[in-house]
Amino acid sequence: MAELACFVSFSLTEDKVVWYPINKKAVQTMLCAKVEKDQRSNYYDTILYGVAPPPEFRNRFKTNERYGLDYESDQYTELVNLLADTLNMVSMPTEKFQFDIVKTVVQVRHLENLLCRIKDVNDILNANVKLRVKAVMIACNLVNETETTPLTESNDIVYQDSYFTITKLDYSNHKLLPLMADEYKITINTKTDIPDRNQTAFAAYIRYNFNKFAAISHGKRHWRLVLHSQLMSHAERLDRKIKSDKKHGRQFSYDDGDMAFVHPGWKTCIGQLCGGTTFEVAKTSLYSIKPSKTVRTATNKIESDLISMVGN
């Protein structure tokens, strides 16, 4: 994660906001600049290379001493150009602009995956500019829009039916913020009501074929399959988000779609956290609640059907 200001700067014209990509030499200059404490929240003028991110975000960038955004990579240049182009297409009126927008935390790995989708000539994001803009705005947390399958970050599809798609998330080859993680993302194909029987069938499929994984939600109507061993760390992260929003007077919104496949322990734990229960108490729910009898029965049917097929 990193703030929008780590990638783009802006200027206010008479009628609209104009966005500009930040170049890697500007970042490098900012990282070695001595800046007064009361000026660190402002964009930094490098004199030679244009505007750099506010020095208060210097810790977001990779150096010899710390892990962070690899601003010297080609992907950084591609991403800043994509963000500037996208934001300029949105055409934000000057009178509606608020400086805090540049402090919005964007999903860096999500955005780098979108770069891969956009480069894929067979992917709809390669040619559909309108869809591309919406997908980028979702990744930047700048719109309250459901991340449906056409808008999702990965196009490595491992399962699909009429309602759901599962894509594999691979961050290991990323240049900006590489991460070794075994995860998948679940998205709905269209915004429509999904019959209970289809939810149950999908929940059973996940439980049988992804039995090392748990389906979780961060409350935005898309879901992740994460290893059971990672449940606690994901819950801790969401707990920090809830506390941060409360501290800064923001309303934390959580919507997992009430889907049958969401891990019941996760659903209970997050529900308790949203209700004010401490993490120490809520975390005990993560591994103590079993799937519903309906889902267990549907899973057993998959197994028995497969055994019958082998027998024949």
From Swiss-Prot:
GO terms for cellular component: host cell cytoplasm. GO terms for biological process: viral genome replication. Signal peptide: none annotated. The active site is at H222 (for ntpase and rtpase activities). Its cofactor is Mg(2+). Its EC number is 3.6.4.-. Residues 202-238 are annotated as: RNA-binding. ATP binds at Q107, V108, R109, K185, H218, G219, K220, R224. It is found in: Host cytoplasm. SUPFAM superfamilies: Rotavirus NSP2 fragment, C-terminal domain, Rotavirus NSP2 fragment, N-terminal domain. GO terms for molecular function: ATP binding; metal ion binding; nucleoside diphosphate kinase activity; ribonucleoside triphosphate phosphatase activity; RNA binding. Changing K185A: Loss of NTPase activity and dsRNA synthesis. No effect on octamerization. Its main location: host cell. Keywords: ATP-binding, Host cytoplasm, Hydrolase, Magnesium, Metal-binding, Nucleotide-binding, RNA-binding. Gene3D superfamilies: Rotavirus NSP2 fragment, C-terminal domain (3.30.428.20), Rotavirus NSP2 fragment, N-terminal domain (3.90.1400.10). It holds the Pfam family Rota_NS35_C. Homooctamer. Interacts with VP1; this interaction is weak. Interacts with NSP5; this interaction leads to up-regulation of NSP5 phosphorylation and formation of viral factories. Interacts with host DCP1A, DCP1B, DDX6, EDC4 and EIF2S1/eIF2-alpha; these interactions are probably part of the sequestration of some host SGs and PBs proteins in viral factories. Belongs to the rotavirus NSP2 family. HAMAP family: ROTA_NSP2. Participates in replication and packaging of the viral genome. Plays a crucial role, together with NSP5, in the formation of virus factories (viroplasms), which are large inclusions in the host cytoplasm where replication intermediates are assembled and viral RNA replication takes place. Displays ssRNA binding, NTPase, RNA triphosphatase (RTPase) and ATP-independent helix-unwinding activities. The unwinding activity may prepare and organize plus-strand RNAs for packaging and replication by removing interfering secondary structures. This is Non-structural protein 2. It comes from Rotavirus C (isolate RVC/Human/United Kingdom/Bristol/1989) (RV-C).
